[in-house]
Amino acid sequence: MKDYKRFVLTVTFAVWLSNSHAQQLSYTAQEIEFIHDSINKSRWDIGGRLSQYTFRYMSEFFPVGVIQKSSQPYQFPNNPKKSFNSIIIKSKTGTLSLDDYLKKLHIASFIVVQKGVVVYEKYFSMLPDDKHTLQSVNKVITSTIITSLINEKKIDVNQSIEKYIPELQGSDWQDISVKDILNMRSGMDNRSIDFETGPFTNPLHKNYQLESALGILPKAETTPSSVYKYLIGLKKDTVPDVQAAYSNINTFVLGWLAEKITGKKYADLVTERIWKPMGASSDAYVCLSDQGIAWPHGGMSATLRDLARFGMLFTKSEIKARNESLVSFAQIKEIFDAPPLTNSFAPFKWAYQWDLANDGVMMKGGFGGQALYIDSNKEIVIAYYNYVDKDWGMNIISDSAFSEIMKALTMDK
């Protein structure tokens, strides 16, 4: 009987998986059972429709720390722009409406906020109350905690990291500035997106060792027993501040720094410094290791509206209203003034953990197609969630699609 049940589940799920780009809002108990039975806990990122589920329900697969909502949530006014109905996106195969274009990319949800008002909002394969993984978009939440501590004079961005984390004294981290870590220029031997070296598949890779120690990836013989001892033992492979190299380890150290300075857990820091003050309407959460260690480089999950609300903190009016406490105009200028990379990762910058800052727009992306765009002066925020393909494609919207959206925002005045 048990074998027959397994056969039925297998056939049913094979049909379900056959359309990996299908958008699905709800799941039967049978589908959920098979998902949990099929996914090794640490390979939730396998891609396709399995990841469509895990990206939406990370708390079913990992321990989490709760990030508490505000008692006075921000109420988004709604004023849909008619101009969005006429947006046409050109592609290699023809033209598509905005809705059809987003569906083709299997976007889970998409929101556009202008001057604090929702002008476009669609949910394709998640619900408004769902808490979707941010992946690396989480990095700019971590860097915002750091900028708030800098603005409170609790951290000197030019000071060496071991001054704040004594455990790093005598290690290769010694004499590396907080600023170099913020800007992905620490020089430490870890590159998280040099995919040919296997950062997520090769147990000998430094990133794999970090993430397996946190429970993100499957444990191997090379998995460290202590993530902190592992970080202390890392070596440099370049001189700090010479070359940017995208590294999850840098962001993890920033999270460690924030916890060390304040004596508080990461989830509580996000709650107290960002989520409650900004008027979050829903609790969020951050995934934890089995030892209760947060993933500050990509472990958060939140509703789409709360991600957009976070983005609003970087608009000109919000920075002024908060007296530059979370982020200052000088820090925004540093992000835009940072030189773009000159290697294969151009035009990325990774200044203060942000990927891009050009033509007035800041952007941060995350694995699988999460993204946050902010035009501070025009008071525009665009945010969306997606899930990873079986080939780990990112499915970020194209520059031309972004341009058409920005163009539509100047209409209907």
What are these regions (language model features)?
Residues 281-284, 332-385:
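Active-site Gly/Thr loop motif
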Residues 22-126, 183, 187, 408-413:
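N-terminal leader/targeting segments and the immediately adjacent pre-domain N-terminus
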Residues 184, 250-257, 296-320, 370-387:
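Active-site-proximal alpha-helical segments within enzyme catalytic domains
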Residues 23-42, 366-413:
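Structured C-terminal helix/loop/strand segments within mature extracytoplasmic catalytic/sensor domains
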Residues 128-129, 195, 208-288, 298:
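Catalytic-site signature segments of enzymes, centered on catalytic residues
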Residues 1-26:
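Bacterial Sec-dependent N-terminal signal peptides
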